[in-house]
């Protein structure tokens, strides 16, 4: 787009913009989207960063909008516990949480219930209820060969999640006609067009 307007920009400049501004946009997006009451779908995806496997914990609501993401080096109960606690702090308690049959997610959920969080929440592990989030992982698995460090992978994924979230929200509301990423970012940042 910039080249079409006569502006010559190196690809490393665009990469630096993504690394710097994607975090800001992600946190603004999270501030504006703080409601999810009915059901959450949670899963983890494997992402290779510099030849080593890392784990991307993701949670979406019943409409498919991303609630939160968290990139971790380990896939264990402690990481799942911290992610569930973080979700509870931001969104409160849903009616149901749908996960796969991963032992770490189940034990973390039981541990949080014993502490007093999620007392009324139902934990479902039915295989086909989690299809929505499994399909939602695709873009991150496709781009895994480009990630060179945990920090850059995290900020790149946050930027991708923000743009996908804006697109999904407009698609769900039926306002995709005339959709513009730049207009949505201006609205997100409170800048008048």
Regions found by a protein language model. Give the residues of each.
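Residue-level recognition of single "structural anchor" positions
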Residues: 1-193
